[in-house]
UniProtKB/Swiss-Prot annotation:
Subunit structure of this chain's protein: F-type ATPases have 2 components, F(1) - the catalytic core - and F(0) - the membrane proton channel. F(1) has five subunits: alpha(3), beta(3), gamma(1), delta(1), epsilon(1). F(0) has three main subunits: a(1), b(2) and c(10-14). The alpha and beta chains form an alternating ring which encloses part of the gamma chain. F(1) is attached to F(0) by a central stalk formed by the gamma and epsilon chains, while a peripheral stalk is formed by the delta and b chains.
GO molecular function terms attached to this record: proton-transporting ATP synthase activity, rotational mechanism
InterPro entries cross-referenced by the UniProt entry: ATP_synth_OSCP/delta_N_sf, ATPase_OSCP/d_CS, ATPase_OSCP/dsu
Biological role stated in the UniProt entry: F(1)F(0) ATP synthase produces ATP from ADP in the presence of a proton or sodium gradient. F-type ATPases consist of two structural domains, F(1) containing the extramembraneous catalytic core and F(0) containing the membrane proton channel, linked together by a central stalk and a peripheral stalk. During catalysis, ATP synthesis in the catalytic domain of F(1) is coupled via a rotary mechanism of the central stalk subunits to proton translocation. This protein is part of the stalk that links CF(0) to CF(1). It either transmits conformational changes from CF(0) to CF(1) or is implicated in proton conduction.
Family: Belongs to the ATPase delta chain family.
Protein name, as recorded: ATP synthase subunit delta
Keyword line: ATP synthesis, Cell membrane, CF(1), Hydrogen ion transport, Ion transport, Membrane, Transport
PANTHER family attached to this UniProt entry: ATP SYNTHASE DELTA CHAIN (PTHR11910)
Topological relation to the membrane, as annotated: Peripheral membrane protein
HAMAP family noted in UniProt: ATP_synth_delta_bact (MF_01416)
A cellular component term, taken from the record's GO annotations: proton-transporting ATP synthase complex
Record's subcellular location: Cell membrane
Amino acid sequence: MDTNIMGFARALVDLAHEEDKVHLFYDNLKVVFDLVKENQDLMSLMNSQVLSKNQKHEIIDVVFKDHLTQTIVDFLKVVIDNREFFHIKSIIKKFFRMIEEEEHTIFINVVSAHELNDDQKAQLVEKLHKKFASQVKILYQTDPSLIAGIRIQSNDLLIDNSIDGKLKLLKHQLRTFSKEN
C-alpha cells in the first residue's frame, strides 16, 4: 500500500482520537466517499492541473463546508495541497478499516422507507452482530423513495432489500436482456 495513503489515514485516525470525534469523522468521511465515488466530475476537478490550489479549495468549501466539520474540510485541502486527491477513496477506506479494527466495531448505515421501531432495531442489531461477529454501531435513516424495505451499507457491504433497489435491478436486467436480443 502506498505510504502516503497510510500516512494520511493514520494522521486522520490520530486527529479523530485527539478531538474525540471518531464517529463524527467516520460519518463525515462516508459523505465524502459516497460523493467522490458517484461524482467523477469532482474527482477530475480536484486532480486537474489547470486549476490552482486556491480554486480547488474554493470548490471544496462550496461542496462540503455546510455538510462537514471544519477539520475534515481542512483535511481535504491538505490532501489537495499534497496532490494526493486521486487517492482520497483509498485514504478514506484505510481510515474506515483502521477505526473498525481499533474499536472492534463495524459501522453500518441502515436506510429504511419508514422509521424502524425498537423491536425491529434490536432484531437488526442482533442479526448484524452475528453476521459480522463483531460489535455494530448503526446509523438509522429514513428515505421514503425506497418505497418499502431496507438498505444496509457498511464499508465493504451493500444489502439492498428495498423496492426501489429491486426496481433498479429489474431495469438493469431488462436493459441487459434487450441488448443481448
